[in-house]
Swiss-Prot record:
Similarity annotation: Belongs to the UPF0178 family.
Identification of the protein by name: UPF0178 protein Pfl01_5469
InterPro entries found in the cross-reference section: UPF0178
Pfam families noted in UniProt: DUF188
Species assigned in the record: Pseudomonas fluorescens (strain Pf0-1)
Amino acid sequence: MRVWIDADACPKMAKELVVKFALKRRFEVVLVAGQPQSKPALALVKLIVVPSGPDAADDYLVEHAVPGELVICSDIPLADRLVKKGVAALDPRGKEFDAQNMGERLATRNLFTDLREQGQVSGGPAPFGDREKQAFANALDRILTRLARQS
């Protein structure tokens, strides 16, 4: 099994949790980034730095992740592409992307993008705290268990 991480936008705490799970469950973690990042000095963790450019990391993830694997990402259009390919996708706050919720997630994203462009909404998501960490850990455990059963 392999877990991919869209590393540029993923909170450090979420990356660390994935590595802890990988050590216990023995799976590979692949960090994909548009810029160099630090990574744990563990054989089961790899870092792939893609050439800079719009959506380069996203395109790499869509091209290389396969059904039966999991991608951690907060990018909703990326998650949509992955779900359509049959790849499991989870955001760092513990919300799984799936075929049933993608339409709503995309519509909400597009609405907030429009509101931000009009100056009606500012800021981003709340800081990543203990509640988000616990929700992510629970969802990660649930999805990894499901994927292990399917393989």
